[in-house]
Amino acid sequence: MEYSKEFMVRLKEEITSDEGVKLEVYLDHLGYPTVGVGHLIKDTDIEHGQGEGYKITQTRCDELFYQDINICLSECEKQMNEWEHFPEEVKLILANMAFNLGITRLMKFKMMFAALNSGDYKEASIQGLDSRWAKQVYNRA
């Protein structure tokens, strides 16, 4: 699925605001090496094995972000039957949640998806906010 430049810019702005940007390798709250906009370093990344404090450029940060967000959007398309019918605002919210939670955990929001799939966005919002995730990430939610 193609996304407009405006959609991608807004998604990047929102996720960057929520996740923060770190241009050096750090350990996340679980002790995993991470860099950029919450990018979990993989064995195939050039940053792998470099250790905490290894610096990357903003260009590399953007590259990693777009790799991650394209995977995230692809997973949303595959897992959510109604994805293409959701309004852009809903897609932005769900993509942000998927980026933060991972698609597997996001798909456990059964009541929220029931409301979304029936077009009841107010109820979907209530269901999304009535979760442990929303309490943990208060301002983001």
Stretch-by-stretch model annotation:
Residues 14, 34-36, 93-96, 123:
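Structural recognition of the beta-strand scaffold that forms the well-ordered cores
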